[in-house]
Structure formats: structure tokens, C-alpha cells
């Protein structure tokens, strides 16, 4: 499996990441159970993660802000952020189509609500407010990379994936997907028994298949 080189210009323009002169890259630190514990970015800033006993991510911390997550089975239900000054953002509730990982709506504690329109694969394409105004849209290429950089208003990508703007990775329940490389940053937890000789690959054909838990690839 070939890992694509880092596109520094894209990361700098879209994520605001600046590279050190001596070329320091990304650093990944892992827990003993194989879950990603921390990312040190090329600019030296750290992003840390915490998980519950089932391996579901419950916290993400970056630059003095911690985002908390509450789950409904294997899909996120609530999220909210708080800063070091104890300021909390409005809680967001995510609704999904029944028994799927396809997001259907975003509800904000202040009363705002938005409907989410997805394609045949369950990938969100657009979001609309109560008045029917389009407030967000995205278009992904075959690897899940965004053709145009939208806001993080709706963080979901391929079905089961949640984008972390701080790292450019997509959290995929049991693994993290790198859209720039077109694969996962860690091996399949069951190794070669998963039937993927690369150990890091995504699904065979992303035009018709999805990996909702990060275990199918």
C-alpha cells in the first residue's frame, strides 16, 4: 500500500497548518488497545482523544477547547464544546435514519434545526434550515477528499466517518481514515484475517461500498 505524500500547500490553505522549516511531519501516539490517543501536528500543536470502555470516542481536545460526545449505540447522539475558561457551546443533537449511519438532521439546543440530504451511499451532500434555505453543501472525490472546502457545519463524510478539522482525518469508529492517502492510518484490528492484504485499505470499490465501523476494508 502506497502512502501519498503530504500536500503542504493544501494543508496550509485549507487547515491553516504551517510546517516547520526542518520538515517535522505528523506524529501519532496510540493506546495499548490500538486507538489513536494523540496527534502532534507539523506546527507542534497537539490534538488528544479519549474513549469509553467500548472504544467510542467521548472527548477531543485541541488548543484549549474540549469537545464531548455522547453516543447512541455506534452513532454519535450529542456533542458540545467547552473552553479552558469554562465557556460551553450549544449542545448539538444528531439524528440518523433508523438503524443506519446516515445522518438525517442536526438539532441545536437554541432551537435551530437543519435537515441533511445524503446520496445513495449515505454521504451527506446538503443541509437546509427550517425555511428551506441551503446552508451547507459538500462534494467528495473517490477517496473522500473534499473538492471544495466547506465549513465544518456537518462533519460527516462517507457513511460512518466524522471529520476532525484539526487533523484532516476522519474518525471511523474503530480506526481513522486519511482521505489524502485513501486508506486508514492503522492496520485492520484482525490483521490478514480481514481479507485485506494491505491491512490499511478502505473498501474495494467506494462507488458502491462503505465501511461504517472501520473494520470492513
Task: State where each predicted segment sits.
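Short beta-strand-alpha-helix junction that forms the catalytic/metal-binding core
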Residues: 196-204
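Compositionally biased, low-complexity segments of secreted and virulence-associated proteins
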Residues: 210, 214-217
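Acidic/glycine-rich beta-solenoid
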Residues: 1-114, 133-135, 141, 148-157
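Short glycine/serine/proline-enriched coil/turn segments at secondary-structure junctions
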Residues: 86-87, 165-168, 193-194
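A conserved catalytic-core signature of glycosyltransferases
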Residues: 91, 171-172, 197-198
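Short, conserved catalytic or interaction motifs in soluble domains
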Residues: 41, 130, 179, 192
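A motif-centric feature for acidic-aromatic and gly/ser/thr-rich catalytic loops and repeats
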Residues: 10-11, 106, 110-174, 180, ...
Amino acid at each position: 500500500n502506497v502512502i501519498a505524500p503530504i500536500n503542504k500547500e493544501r494543508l496550509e490553505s485549507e487547515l491553516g497548518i504551517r510546517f516547520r522549516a526542518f520538515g517535522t511531519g505528523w506524529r501519532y501516539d496510540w493506546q495499548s488497545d490500538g486507538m489513536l490517543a494523540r496527534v502532534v501536528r507539523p506546527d507542534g500543536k497537539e490534538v488528544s482523544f479519549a474513549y469509553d470502555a467500548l472504544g467510542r470516542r467521548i472527548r477531543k481536545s485541541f488548543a484549549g477547547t474540549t469537545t464531548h460526545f455522547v453516543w447512541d449505540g455506534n452513532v454519535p447522539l450529542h456533542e458540545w464544546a467547552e473552553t479552558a475558561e469554562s465557556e460551553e457551546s450549544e449542545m448539538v443533537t444528531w439524528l440518523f435514519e433508523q438503524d443506519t449511519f446516515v445522518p438525517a438532521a442536526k438539532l441545536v439546543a437554541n432551537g435551530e434545526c437543519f435537515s441533511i440530504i445524503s446520496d445513495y451511499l449515505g454521504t451527506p451532500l446538503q443541509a437546509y434550515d427550517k425555511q428551506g434555505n441551503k446552508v451547507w453543501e459538500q462534494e467528495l472525490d473517490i477517496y473522500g477528499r473534499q473538492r471544495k472546502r466547506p465549513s465544518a457545519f456537518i462533519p460527516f463524510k462517507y457513511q460512518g466517518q466524522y471529520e476532525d478539522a484539526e487533523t484532516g482525518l476522519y474518525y471511523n469508529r474503530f480506526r481513522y481514515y486519511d482521505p489524502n492517502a485513501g486508506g486508514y492510518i492503522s492496520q485492520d484490528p484482525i490483521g490478514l484475517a480481514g481479507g485485506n492484504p494491505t491491512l490499511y485499505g478502505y473498501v474495494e470499490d467506494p462507488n458502491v461500498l462503505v465501511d461504517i465501523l472501520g473494520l470492513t476494508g
